[in-house]
A protein has these predicted regions:
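Conserved CoA-thioester-binding segment of acyl-CoA-metabolizing enzymes
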Residues: 1-57, 92
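C-terminal alpha-helix plus adjacent terminal tail
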Residues: 1-13, 22, 47, 163-169, ...
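Glycine- (often His-adjacent) and acidic-residue-rich active-site loop
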Residues: 8, 35, 56-90, 109, ...
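Terminal peptide-recognition signature
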Residues: 18, 36, 54, 66, ...
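Catalytic-core regions built around general acid/base machinery
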Residues: 39, 86-97
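Crotonase-fold acyl-CoA enzyme core
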Residues: 92-205, 236-237, 241-245
C-alpha cells in the first residue's frame, strides 16, 4: 500500500501492522481518516492477512481531530455532514474490519483516538498511554458512545465533563486494556497476541468477530440464539473439520480459511 502517505501498512506473515504517521501528534486529518478507512477495507479483502495491529508513530497515538484541517474542510453547505460521515466511517472501518484488530496504544489517545481504540477488538497500552475526551475544552462533544463500551457511567461522564485523562496503569486496573507494559514491550506484546489469533482458523476468527459485533446490541435470548446459529455455520467449514481431526490426531491443525 505504497500509495498511502499518512498511514503505513507492513505485512509480516498473517499479521498486518497499520501505523498512523501524521506528525507531530497524529491528529485525525482528512487524509489520515480516508487512508485508514481504505487500508482496513483492503485488509478485509486480503485473504493472506488474518489479524491487524493498529498503532502510531511517535509519542502520541492520536491527539484527536485535526481542528485546523476541520476548519479548512468545512466551508459550505453539506461540508459538516460530509465531514461527520467520513469520521464515523473511519471508526466503523476498524470495528467492521473482517480481521480482528489489536490496538497498541503507544501514547495519548484523545477524542477520535479514543474512538479508534474503542472500535478495536483487543487493547494493549504502554505505560505512557492515556485515554481522554478533551472536547469539552474546545466547545465540542467527543466520542462518548464509543467510550461507553469501555468505561462505567460515572467515569465516562467525569471524563466527558472535565476532560480528565485515564493513564495506562488505571486503564489496566479498570480492565479496559489487556496489559500495560513499558514502551519498548508494547509492540512485542501486541504482536504476540496477534500471532496467537492468526494461528487460529481464519474462518472462526472472522465469523467470531462478526458475531461479537452483532450480539453486542441484542438481548441475552436473541444474542445467544444468533451465536448458536453462527456456530452451526462455522461447524460446516473445512477448517472446523480440520480442527477436530487435528485434535483427535494430537497434531497442529493446518487451516485453509475455508
Amino acid at each position: 500500500m505504497d500509495d498511502l502517505t499518512q498511514v503505513k501498512v507492513k505485512a509480516d506473515g498473517h499479521v498486518a501492522t497499520v501505523t498512523m504517521d501524521n506528525p507531530p501528534v497524529n491528529a485525525l486529518s482528512r487524509t489520515m481518516n480516508d487512508e485508514l478507512t481504505l487500508a482496513l477495507d483492503r485488509i478485509s479483502e486480503t485473504d493472506e492477512i488474518r489479524v491487524v495491529v493498529l498503532t502510531a508513530a511517535g509519542k502520541v497515538f492520536c491527539a484527536g481531530a485535526d481542528l485546523k484541517g476541520r476548519a479548512e474542510n468545512i466551508k459550505g453547505p453539506g461540508d459538516f455532514m460530509a465531514h461527520n460521515r467520513r469520521t464515523r466511517e473511519c471508526f466503523h472501518a476498524i470495528r467492521e474490519c473482517a480481521k480482528p484488530v489489536v490496538c497498541a496504544i503507544n501514547g495519548a489517545a484523545l477524542g477520535s483516538g479514543l474512538a479508534m481504540a474503542a472500535s478495536s477488538d483487543v487493547l494493549i497500552a504502554s505505560e505512557k498511554a492515556s485515554l481522554g475526551l478533551p472536547e469539552v475544552d474546545v466547545g465540542l462533544l467527543g466520542g462518548c458512545r464509543h467510550a461507553m463500551r469501555l468505561f462505567s457511567h460515572s467515569r465516562l461522564r467525569r471524563m466527558a465533563l472535565t476532560g480528565m485523562r485515564v493513564d495506562g496503569a488505571e486503564l489496566y486496573r479498570l480492565g479496559v486494556v489487556e496489559a500495560c507494559v513499558p514502551p519498548e514491550a508494547l509492540m512485542p506484546k501486541a504482536l504476540e497476541i496477534a500471532r496467537t489469533i492468526a494461528s487460529k482458523s481464519p474462518v472462526s476468527t472472522r465469523m467470531g468477530k462478526h458475531t461479537l459485533n452483532v450480539i453486542e446490541d441484542m438481548s441475552l435470548r436473541d444474542g445467544y440464539r444468533y451465536e448458536q446459529d453462527m456456530t452451526a455455520q462455522i461447524g460446516k467449514t473445512d477448517d472446523a473439520r480440520e480442527a477436530q481431526r487435528a485434535f483427535a490426531e494430537k497434531r497442529a491443525p493446518v487451516f485453509t480459511g475455508r
